[in-house]
Amino acid sequence: MRDRLLAAEKVRAIEWRDSTLYLLDQRALPFEESWIAYDSAAGVAEAIRSMVVCGAPAIGISAAYGLVLAACGRSVAGGDWFAALEEDFTLLVDAAPAAVNLSWALNRMRERLERVREHADPLAALEAEALAIHESDREANLTMAQLGVDLIRRHQGNPQALLTHSNTGALATGGFGTALGVIRAAWLEGMVERVYADETRPWLQGSRLTAWELASEGIPVTVNVDAAAAHIMKTKGVTWVVVGADRITANGDVANQIGTYQLAVNAMHHGVRFMVVAPSSSIDMSLASGDDIPLAERAGEELLEIAGKRLGEGVEGFNPLFDVTPADLIDAIVTEKGVVERPDTAKMAQLMCRKRLH
């Protein structure tokens, strides 16, 4: 499976070359493939804020490279550049304060920095750590893809319809994707008849990004309006909903792109299994449940303009980025450490004690 996935790889969204970070601008897709070069932490932070790069793992990887860029700039300026990097840590964290992968990646970089203060070449050591974070995510994607396929096969090995939400593919990670990585692997194993991709309003990550990724690999994909998901589950033979996660709490609650919660409710009603695929870096054991997750919102004004005209006075917009799916609606959480079925606090704690499977 690993070799087949590697051979099928067509999309990469993050590249590090000659001490420069290159990001595929997701805002321009699918109409234009445009790469933007970054040489500062401030630029990377803005890329995260403005959604040039999306997806929890991809944000964390980009932030790690952003810190390398900051270190390079600080070292040239001279003085105690180690201490000065604290400003860059804060700048990058503030770009997406709710993204646990970002804080995880930066904390790992901070720990590495503490160990290399007396290193002959601390900048090279920091760069190596960022590259390791990137490669580790890629390897985790491969492991999760295999585990997810095994889970699907255990219930049904025949070609079947799957439904997904937002974008969880190569654009959102350092490799093949989390949920979309599982779907890719299932396609290679002959277990996918068609993928239904929620358009995922208001940023349309499903129709702009997921459909583009799947179509580029010849995987049959149908884009549907978000509100049609329940109807599709009822009439199109969907067997699994496969989604990613921005944050998972100690009890197995999952924060993800807005609309995920209603998918889980509808899946349970229709007897459709619900799988969450995310690296263990998305798990925040410091939060007891989803009630503790700060859920970001974008400006409600974004919803109040149609064809360049604002809706009538007295109308307000509610524009949440995320919602929380309770653990009791989830059939399985797939990570690179293993699979947790019917997650709860005890099972999540046991999972986090395991070593990575790759």
From Swiss-Prot:
Gene that specifies this protein: mtnA
Instruction: Please tell me which top-level EC class this enzyme sits in.
Output: isomerase
Name under which the protein is recorded: Methylthioribose-1-phosphate isomerase
Q: Which domain of life is it from?
A: Bacteria
Please report which protein family the annotation says this sequence is part of.
Belongs to the eIF-2B alpha/beta/delta subunits family. MtnA subfamily.
Q: What is the lineage of its organism?
A: Bacteria, Pseudomonadati, Pseudomonadota, Gammaproteobacteria, Pseudomonadales
Q: Give binding positions for substrate.
A: C54, G55, A56, Q205, N256, Q257
The record's keywords, sorted A to Z, are: Amino-acid biosynthesis, Isomerase, Methionine biosynthesis
GO terms, biological process: L-methionine salvage from methylthioadenosine
Q: What does this protein do?
A: Catalyzes the interconversion of methylthioribose-1-phosphate (MTR-1-P) into methylthioribulose-1-phosphate (MTRu-1-P).
Identify the pathway.
Amino-acid biosynthesis; L-methionine biosynthesis via salvage pathway; L-methionine from S-methyl-5-thio-alpha-D-ribose 1-phosphate: step 1/6
Positions of the catalytic residues: D246
List the NCBIfam families hit by this protein, alphabetically: eIF-2B_rel (TIGR00524), PRK05720.1 (NF004326), salvage_mtnA (TIGR00512)
Q: Which organism is it from?
A: Pseudomonas fluorescens (strain ATCC BAA-477 / NRRL B-23932 / Pf-5)
